[in-house]
Amino acid sequence: GEIECSSSECCPSGKHLCKGGFVHYCCPNDRYMSCGILGFGTCYCWKADYYEYGSTPTC
């Protein structure tokens, strides 16, 4: 499922904080995060068919 992201002081400019269960990552703010089936897979920042790894929040 898609995980909504929101702006946060814990992420650098241009990235939003995405919270998926125990996983918190910063994704580019034009993407959403998904952690695979049931949310237990590897989390990626998605946009259409393209994905990248999220970065670790600073706080």
Curated annotation (Swiss-Prot):
Disulfide bonds: none annotated. Contains 5 disulfide bonds. It is found in: Secreted; Nematocyst. Keywords: Disulfide bond, Nematocyst, Secreted, Toxin. Its main location: secreted. It comes from the Eukaryota. GO terms for molecular function: toxin activity. GO terms for cellular component: extracellular region; nematocyst. This is U-actitoxin-Aer2a. It comes from Anemonia erythraea. The lineage of its organism: Eukaryota, Metazoa, Cnidaria, Anthozoa, Hexacorallia.
